[in-house]
């Protein structure tokens, strides 16, 4: 599956906010880049022009895509499914993204970024209900048990991530985690209130509805 592999700070500068693409320690070192260069990558703009309605819609879409590490084709499929699912399309879209396995690992604290979580999943370090799953977009359901494979439990990455998660209490409220057993469980489906990305999802719906 195609993935963006370039500098993630450029993506955050493009959107003008922290998209949680880097861990807090690394981001702290590069924070000045976001603060001092409050403009998209490239030459400093001579004059900030008025953004069009389409431009605003596009920025909202790109913000969400980049935060969750999803490319256009797959994002479009998520939207189409969300539009045909009972409920509010925009909120359905965000819920589908939150239920991705890579995001759940991040929400549980086993990974410091979604990008790192994708790496763990792709290298088959993750079990779902006792079975290896190497598909980052795997959608979890209530009651699913997520585990770190035994051989990977002693990894320095996992040990450091768990310490950080415990220190800042970053675990999402819709999952439970037992760090001593390197496992967690999905307690409920995420709702709009659980989304910590400042996004206007209705704007994305309007963009795709044209």
Swiss-Prot record:
What are the protein's UniProt keywords? Answer: Ribonucleoprotein, Ribosomal protein, RNA-binding, rRNA-binding
What is the superkingdom listed in this entry's lineage?
A: Bacteria
Region: Disordered; residue ranges are 30-49
| Any one GO cellular component localisation term in the record | small ribosomal subunit
Q: A biological process (GO) annotation for this entry?
A: ribosomal small subunit biogenesis
One Pfam family here: S4
Q: Pinpoint the S4 RNA-binding domain residues.
A: 99-162
GO molecular function ontology, one term from the record:
rRNA binding
Looking up InterPro entries in the UniProt record yields:
Ribosomal_uS4, Ribosomal_uS4_bac-type, Ribosomal_uS4_CS, Ribosomal_uS4_N, S4_RNA-bd, S4_RNA-bd_sf
Q: Which family does it belong to?
A: Belongs to the universal ribosomal protein uS4 family.
The subunit field of the Swiss-Prot or TrEMBL record says: Part of the 30S ribosomal subunit. Contacts protein S5. The interaction surface between S4 and S5 is involved in control of translational fidelity.
Q: Which HAMAP family match?
A: Ribosomal_uS4_B
Q: Relate the protein's function as given in its record.
A: One of the primary rRNA binding proteins, it binds directly to 16S rRNA where it nucleates assembly of the body of the 30S subunit. With S5 and S12 plays an important role in translational accuracy.
- Please give the name of this protein: Small ribosomal subunit protein uS4
Q: What is the species of this protein?
A: Leptospira biflexa serovar Patoc (strain Patoc 1 / ATCC 23582 / Paris)
């Amino acid at each position: 599956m195609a993935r963006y592999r370039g500098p993630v700070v450029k993506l955050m500068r493009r959107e003008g906010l922290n998209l949680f693409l880097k861990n807090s320690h690394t981001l702290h070192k590069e924070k000045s880049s976001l603060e001092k260069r409050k403009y998209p990558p490239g030459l400093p703009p001579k004059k900030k022009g008025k953004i069009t309605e389409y431009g605003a819609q596009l920025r909202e879409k790109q913000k969400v895509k980049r935060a969750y590490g999803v490319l256009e084709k797959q994002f479009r499929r998520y939207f189409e499914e969300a539009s045909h699912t009972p409920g509010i399309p925009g909120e359905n879209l965000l819920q589908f993204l939150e239920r991705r396995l890579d995001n759940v690992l991040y929400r549980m604290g086993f990974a410091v970024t979604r990008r790192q979580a994708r790496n763990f999943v792709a290298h088959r370090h993750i079990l779902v209900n006792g079975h290896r799953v190497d598909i980052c977009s795997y959608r979890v359901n209530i009651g699913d048990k997520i585990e770190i494979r035994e051989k990977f439990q002693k990894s320095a990455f996992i040990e450091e991530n768990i310490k950080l998660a415990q220190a800042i209490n970053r675990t999402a409220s819709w999952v439970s985690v037992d760090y001593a057993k390197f496992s967690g469980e999905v307690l409920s489906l995420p709702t709009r209130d659980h989304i910590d990305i400042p996004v206007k999802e209705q704007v994305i719906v309007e963009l795709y509805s044209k």
